[in-house]
Amino acid sequence: MQANDRPRTFHLTVAYDGTEYCGWQVQPEQRSIQSELERVIRPLAGRPVRVLGSGRTDAGVHAIGQVARCVLPVWKADTVALQRAINSKLPNDIRVKAVRETRERFHPIADATGKQYQYLVQVGGSRDPFANRFVNRVGGPIDHSAMQSAAAKFVGRHDFKAFQGTGAERPSTVRTIHSARWIPRVATGPTGAELEGEHWCFEIDGEGFLYNMVRNLMGTMLEVGRGKKSPNWIDEVLASRDRKMAGPTAPPQGLFLCRVDYPDEVFQVEEPDVIE
């Protein structure tokens, strides 16, 4: 076999506006991010290709750094050419930001060592028609110091069963969170004018997350920010392991999957035997 005739496995970094999609995963009779990528990559591969993502994002959730894997039976050009070929056929609200070749056995879920999510919140001010799909607007006032204290409660290794959404239960609900913090931000519209209200970003890094976990953490912290609960209530919710004890699920539109981390060895491509 010639080196350029072997199947090649690729790591795609994908960004998308999830507003018009049913989510990442293929669903019958609906548009999904996965189905759009598979539709575009199929003619490049000459056959149906399964595109596997690093995790499911729900309808309305966005990504800056989702990771997907695809295997092409024969691709003789470089990764830049593949990126351009895919992007030339994708709709405007999905883009492949980078393509890297990986080892054959690369798995975007099993090989991931960490993820980062951000959730954008607008406190007060009028709802902006352009930013509306990317931010959760809430009424004020909000106690940001209390929410910062609540966020700190999530850092470390905990059982997050109380924050697991229904429909995708995992055998273990224990996860390690490396950092969780609220960051003030300046938000601007298409013309560069600063938007009304206060704008905040909740940023969380961890080894992995349960289904709907970040949105459930958000809804719970907002209960604290509104003064309905104290930051110490978070300890009670974690200890309860009961979803009913936590706050409501926050809306999807403020959530972004920003980054998925992998060890360097994922990108160490095995050299095939070359038959002279």
From Swiss-Prot:
Its EC number is 5.4.99.12. GO terms for molecular function: pseudouridine synthase activity; RNA binding; tRNA pseudouridine(38-40) synthase activity. GO terms for biological process: tRNA pseudouridine synthesis. Substrate binds at residue 117. Keywords: Isomerase, tRNA processing. Pfam families: PseudoU_synth_1 (PF01416). It comes from the Bacteria. Transmembrane segments: none annotated. It is an enzyme of class 5 (isomerase). InterPro entries: PsdUridine_synth_cat_dom_sf (IPR020103), PsdUridine_synth_TruA (IPR001406), PsdUridine_synth_TruA_a/b_dom (IPR020097), PsdUridine_synth_TruA_C (IPR020095), TruA/RsuA/RluB/E/F_N (IPR020094). It catalyses: uridine(38/39/40) in tRNA = pseudouridine(38/39/40) in tRNA. The keyword tRNA processing applies. The active site is at 58 (nucleophile). PANTHER family: PSEUDOURIDYLATE SYNTHASE (PTHR11142), TRNA PSEUDOURIDINE SYNTHASE-LIKE 1 (PTHR11142:SF0). Homodimer. Belongs to the tRNA pseudouridine synthase TruA family. Formation of pseudouridine at positions 38, 39 and 40 in the anticodon stem and loop of transfer RNAs. This is tRNA pseudouridine synthase A. It comes from Rhodopirellula baltica (strain DSM 10527 / NCIMB 13988 / SH1). The gene is truA.
